[in-house]
Swiss-Prot record:
Main location: membrane
The protein, known as: A-type potassium channel modulatory protein DPP6
Spans traversing the lipid bilayer: 96-116
UniProt keyword annotation of Transcription present: no
Molecular function GO terms recorded: potassium channel regulator activity; serine-type peptidase activity
The organism's taxonomic lineage, starting at the top: Eukaryota, Metazoa, Chordata, Craniata, Vertebrata
Encoding gene, per UniProt annotation: DPP6
Organism in which the protein naturally occurs: Homo sapiens (Human)
Amino acid sequence: MASLYQRFTGKINTSRSFPAPPEASHLLGGQGPEEDGGAGAKPLGPRAQAAAPRERGGGGGGAGGRPRFQYQARSDGDEEDELVGSNPPQRNWKGIAIALLVILVICSLIVTSVILLTPAEDNSLSQKKKVTVEDLFSEDFKIHDPEAKWISDTEFIYREQKGTVRLWNVETNTSTVLIEGKKIESLRAIRYEISPDREYALFSYNVEPIYQHSYTGYYVLSKIPHGDPQSLDPPEVSNAKLQYAGWGPKGQQLIFIFENNIYYCAHVGKQAIRVVSTGKEGVIYNGLSDWLYEEEILKTHIAHWWSPDGTRLAYAAINDSRVPIMELPTYTGSIYPTVKPYHYPKAGSENPSISLHVIGLNGPTHDLEMMPPDDPRMREYYITMVKWATSTKVAVTWLNRAQNVSILTLCDATTGVCTKKHEDESEAWLHRQNEEPVFSKDGRKFFFIRAIPQGGRGKFYHITVSSSQPNSSNDNIQSITSGDWDVTKILAYDEKGNKIYFLSTEDLPRRRQLYSANTVGNFNRQCLSCDLVENCTYFSASFSHSMDFFLLKCEGPGVPMVTVHNTTDKKKMFDLETNEHVKKAINDRQMPKVEYRDIEIDDYNLPMQILKPATFTDTTHYPLLLVVDGTPGSQSVAEKFEVSWETVMVSSHGAVVVKCDGRGSGFQGTKLLHEVRRRLGLLEEKDQMEAVRTMLKEQYIDRTRVAVFGKDYGGYLSTYILPAKGENQGQTFTCGSALSPITDFKLYASAFSERYLGLHGLDNRAYEMTKVAHRVSALEEQQFLIIHPTADEKIHFQHTAELITQLIRGKANYSLQIYPDESHYFTSSSLKQHLYRSIINFFVECFRIQDKLLTVTAKEDEEED
């Protein structure tokens, strides 16, 4: 028998060739009525097609395993034999009439029953459109976030859909225009910010991304509402592209950063002065993060913090001079490729050094360094959190390089002396080290989140209050909350009402509800958001300065919306944003049905999210796509609104998509979280495979069409999982894809790899065991698509190059899709569309492979006959 398909290694698809739209596909395991040769022919699934007898030596068989019909012709002589010598029987016309009448009655009853019992949505579904890639980028599906921000006890600033910026007073229920949308449009501004005194607006335009959060751009100032724009520049340069600019907490004071130096302006119109001048481009960063701090530690590009009264500025000084340099090549646009060098610490290499400084802004500039803890475990450290407690006290969290010891200190901004307030230690790693404490006005009491033992499931994250007593060096510490659930964020402290407001998973791990708790007495809790907004269980919130009002942002599962509430009775005052245009678009589409399920495994649960087609039936066979993320501490199963390429796979191509949170995931206790320590991939594979096995037990899943996809760390997992064997040691997955996969953790960022695998160089066994090179030798049969931008600054193309070397040695069947000179985050909308089409088309073709194999087999059998 001839080969069913030609295996290949090293097939490289350029951006022109891969996403060519596939032919009309039928992923549901059967042919549509327009293809099967007759209006009444019943569609066959892949199994039925494989089992159906094939016609031998005759014509009429269609491609793709169509059902074939054999006709036996009768000769004229046969007709004569039937006609000659036959006597017509006597017919009972009365009986025939009665029988016909009964048949008509029965048929009418059947038709009536079908009409009555058919759900109304089935009729409406046929009128709805399927979700397409174009929809993902259309205005109809674009969620508008008003970016509402409280600026007083009763006022907040927000932006309308058309771009106009308004000030809303909840007490008088009136609004004032601050910036017309047309003005923002005329300036081509990407971002805006209003000064604290509401006199000026700061705009940025011609913004150029650097990494995930950082960018450079031009800035202008404009008097509200109709002033002419004034360029914001350092005294020595005109028309300068700045790395950052932003207002302070008072009046019109602002700072901006140029060439890693900090400039301060007391008010608009006054010349800026350089207050920090030790910066060196690409090497010494003042007030800004380098790559490692932006991506893995602070998770923002901003590394400076104003005191509440605006008299001081704390800033981080990050020195990359000893950090090895990575070079990102640029292949297009010039005859010879060029490179962009930047400092990137990999596992075991030199890390950036960091120090925290405070400068006074009133009078002569005085720079004072805050002293790190005098602890031998802190020989190398990260600064993970900075928060002002008062105008002279600043809280700092110091984390050792191994990331298993952290110390929270309160530093005196006038002396630089730091006092230890809390210490945490773990045998594994310390999670959630960016959490900001919330302080009382005098700074003597503060609330922070720490992990507290809660029984067999390990520790959960809860609110603790620390109170310092006058004339005493000891602090009184009490836990405000407890239970086998997590506080995810502290929002506000109402000192007058003795209440703390926070978000938690107490309802369910996949939800985020808004709660309050008393800070005195028995710490009673109350859910403020439960059953408050229809079809909303995942919230974030912000409170007015007086705590009398709050903005409630619904993030799912329904279409996101923002409402304004009174804190006293939770009563909704008005809707700020409902995204009606998105609701209409959703109602006009065949959106996936979302189901949640828990699998019980030994002593833990495995939460699953299942996306099914809107037209789902138990009798149809659907392909299964497993989507993995699984970065330790993350969560894939959450009740958040999302329309993604996975939605397109379900809606337009009839796939079932499943996600799950196994060992290593967050919000289920530290025991489950820390189980993956020093063995990344091993336990995640077992849990993800358990989810797949559970789905394969369902009669509606086609066992011959199962795929896996992941990006970043999920790309590592999808590559790790793809060769996994199922029952009887057979292949589970037909195909798989990885986007920017991590393939060797010693090539990845130091802070990430060392957090989970330990310090490289001391014991490298964990690094060797987690290499995917050990797994790819089994990838001879499955289709494997690797996608990687060549200028990926987070997960270098080096990872994919190493992987491909192993794939070639293993004679694996793979395809490679590259994006020349594109960064990790795909800032271009057109490239994102191309990316999504590439992924979707790959899986569509993969899920059609069984039909192709059946067709080839049928043709070969016919040739043999």
